[in-house]
């Protein structure tokens, strides 16, 4: 059965999701997009991307639609998600990627409009279930979970990074720093922002700011709830981020044992979600990598009970591929 998808919000993540679905999945069909932008602009930004390059098929704007190759995708422009005709369009799953409707009560409006499930492409509040694939997706219950959060890109990287290490040697406590690409929540030039650090020009500064990944990890790995803390450093790159996790372990270990644990995970149960590399990478090397976490073996350190591990991630493309994987998982039980 082909699962019919609607995308609410056609910004960076919405367009990346569209590209990922087109590149990977014959099981999913994007049938409609809702965004307040004008159709010619939306079509142009899908066709030409500063990071991903040109779309591999011809993209043209039509009245109320975008034509991609031989497919026509309906375009809606509705502010109220409850007014969207998902049922009339036969949409099974809505990917909520506006960044606005992250509260489950608001996201549930998509269900009122006829969708069967909603995936929030962000950390959420009041959701039925928060999932990180490879970590807790086995707990998904289609009978109980309708509004599902895919957590954040950082939580997807940290979740895999932490679970492999916790399963191998046990994590007692730890600190995480994500060195993260700038996002649209920041300013191109100095301008007012509720976070005074984010008020500063994104392309000119290293910007310390908060990260909810450590708190969110408790939702997907309850045994680590309250054991990790975190913050972020936003840096002047458009995509390509890295998680630096330093923990106190419950037993002694070695660099070799830690690396072996990640190598086994990457070639086994985490294949496709976790990649293992020995090469000396920089951030542009992982742009376009679909993995949740690219483990950088050469940066592994052990000092007494402390272990440092580092995982790269394309915060747009990797995360969007997880959204496609999650939609496929949910769709398999509709």
From Swiss-Prot:
SMART domains reported in the protein's UniProt record: Gp_dh_N
Subcellular location: Cytoplasm
GO biological process terms, semicolon-separated: glucose metabolic process; glycolytic process
Means of activity regulation: Inhibited by pentalenolactone (PL).
Binding-site list for D-glyceraldehyde 3-phosphate: 152-154, 183, 198, 211-212, 234
Location (main, coarse): cytoplasm
InterPro entries found in the cross-reference section: GlycerAld/Erythrose_P_DH, GlycerAld_3-P_DH_AS, GlycerAld_3-P_DH_cat, GlycerAld_3-P_DH_NAD(P)-bd, Glyceraldehyde-3-P_DH_1, NAD(P)-bd_dom_sf
Any one GO cellular component localisation term in the record: cytoplasm
PROSITE patterns to which the protein is assigned, alphabetical: GAPDH
One Pfam family matching this protein: Gp_dh_C
Keywords for this protein: Cytoplasm, Glycolysis, NAD, Nucleotide-binding, Oxidoreductase
Pathway info: Carbohydrate degradation; glycolysis; pyruvate from D-glyceraldehyde 3-phosphate: step 1/5
Stated induction or repression of this protein's expression: In the absence of pentalenolactone (PL).
Domain of life: Bacteria
Active site location: 153 (nucleophile)
GO molecular function: glyceraldehyde-3-phosphate dehydrogenase (NAD+) (phosphorylating) activity; NAD binding; NADP binding
CDD domains assigned: GAPDH_I_C, GAPDH_I_N
Gene3D superfamilies: Dihydrodipicolinate Reductase, domain 2, NAD(P)-binding Rossmann-like Domain
Residues that hold NAD(+) according to the record: 12-13, 35, 79, 315
Enzyme Commission no: 1.2.1.12
Function comment: Catalyzes the oxidative phosphorylation of glyceraldehyde 3-phosphate (G3P) to 1,3-bisphosphoglycerate (BPG) using the cofactor NAD. The first reaction step involves the formation of a hemiacetal intermediate between G3P and a cysteine residue, and this hemiacetal intermediate is then oxidized to a thioester, with concomitant reduction of NAD to NADH. The reduced NADH is then exchanged with the second NAD, and the thioester is attacked by a nucleophilic inorganic phosphate to produce BPG.
NCBIfam families found in the cross-reference section: GAPDH-I
Family per similarity comment: Belongs to the glyceraldehyde-3-phosphate dehydrogenase family.
Assembly and binders: Homotetramer.
Protein name: Glyceraldehyde-3-phosphate dehydrogenase 2
């Amino acid at each position: 059965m082909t699962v019919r998808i609607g995308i609410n919000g056609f910004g960076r993540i919405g367009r990346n999701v569209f590209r990922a679905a087109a590149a990977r999945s014959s099981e999913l069909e994007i049938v409609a997009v809702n965004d307040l932008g004008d159709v010619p602009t939306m079509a142009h930004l899908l066709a030409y991307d500063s990071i991903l390059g040109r779309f591999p098929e011809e993209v043209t704007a039509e009245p109320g639609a975008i034509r991609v190759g031989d497919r026509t995708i309906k375009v809606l422009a509705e502010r109220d998600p409850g007014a969207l005709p998902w049922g009339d369009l036969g949409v099974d799953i809505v990917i909520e990627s506006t960044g606005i409707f992250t509260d489950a009560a608001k996201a549930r409006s998509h269900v009122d409009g006829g969708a069967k499930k909603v995936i929030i492409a962000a950390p959420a509040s009041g959701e039925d279930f928060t999932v990180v694939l490879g970590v807790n997706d086995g707990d998904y219950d289609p009978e109980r979970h309708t509004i599902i959060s895919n957590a954040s890109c950082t939580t997807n990287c940290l979740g895999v990074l932490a679970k492999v290490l916790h399963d191998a040697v046990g994590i007692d406590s730890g600190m995480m720093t994500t060195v993260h690409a700038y996002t649209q929540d920041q300013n191109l030039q100095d301008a007012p922002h509720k976070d005074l650090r984010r008020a500063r020009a994104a392309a000119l500064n290293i910007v310390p700011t908060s990260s909810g990944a450590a708190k969110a990890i408790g939702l997907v790995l309850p045994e680590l709830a309250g054991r990790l803390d975190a913050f972020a450093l936003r840096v002047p790159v458009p995509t390509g981020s890295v998680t630096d996790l330093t923990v106190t372990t419950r037993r002694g270990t070695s660099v070799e044992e830690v690396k072996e644990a990640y190598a086994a995970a990457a070639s086994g149960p985490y294949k496709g979600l976790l990649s293992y590399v020995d090469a000396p990478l920089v951030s542009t090397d992982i742009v376009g990598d679909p993995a949740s976490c690219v483990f950088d073996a050469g940066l592994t350190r052990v000092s007494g009970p402390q272990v440092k591990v580092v995982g790269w991630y394309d915060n747009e493309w990797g995360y969007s591929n997880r959204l496609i994987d999650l939609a496929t998982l949910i769709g398999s039980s509709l």
